[in-house]
Amino acid sequence: MKERKFINEAVKRLLVCEYVVKETENAGFGNMVMKRTPFGTNITLYVNRPGLVIGRRGSKVQQMTDTLEKKYGIETPQIEVKDVKDPDLNPSVIAKKIALSLEKGWSYRKAGNTSLNRTIQAGAKGVLIKISGKISGERARYQKFIYGNVKYSGEPGSKGMITGFSTAKLKVGILGVTVKILNPEYKLPDVFSIENITGGEEVGTESKADQTDVEGRETGNAEES
């Protein structure tokens, strides 16, 4: 029963995330944090343009709150909208920008390289941009734009890399845009630092006070003899 409950909660969370992404797509969805509290469910949305999500006099937020409670069964949802601190380091925002550029007629190379350079200038340590679909010709293929430290497997790949995805609707079909950025706060296993310890006494050496005390005892013994 507990396993089924966990599965149902995971499915519900996924459905809520899909709904929120769809509703905030034009505002530049960045991330969603969902937490349960004794007073209800707190949902924090990080978007590039909060005003589009809040709506006039909070009408958009109220509409989303009602939908989450009635359609998805979220207990007393409380939505808080925050601005993305650095859009150029948020993979979801970057993926959406690339998709919009492709829909405006940009070539996939221009859209990919422009976003890659902007992300590098923002201080990213590792970036992967992948545009897939009928980007040139009738056959579907993909093009990658890579910079720096990019991890594909293991714990660094699953926990260290932040992923964002979006789609661009063109006449030739739908193009998929995947963006992965190495989390600046994640410490790679092969990166270490050596601390410089200062202010303490070296091991195996005697302090000046100890040496004086020893010399005094030796002198006293010599006088007695």
UniProtKB/Swiss-Prot annotation:
PROSITE patterns: KH_TYPE_2. Residues 16-85 form the KH type-2 domain. Residues 202-225 are annotated as: Disordered. PANTHER family: 30S/40S RIBOSOMAL PROTEIN S3 (PTHR11760), SMALL RIBOSOMAL SUBUNIT PROTEIN US3 (PTHR11760:SF32). Binds the lower part of the 30S subunit head. NCBIfam families: PRK04191.1, uS3_euk_arch. The keyword Oxidoreductase does not apply. It holds the Pfam family KH_2. Belongs to the universal ribosomal protein uS3 family. GO terms for biological process: translation. The gene is rps3. Part of the 30S ribosomal subunit. One of its GO terms (molecular function) is rRNA binding. This is Small ribosomal subunit protein uS3. It comes from the Archaea. The keyword Ribosomal protein applies. Residues 205-225 have a biased composition (Basic and acidic residues). One of its GO terms (cellular component) is cytosolic small ribosomal subunit.
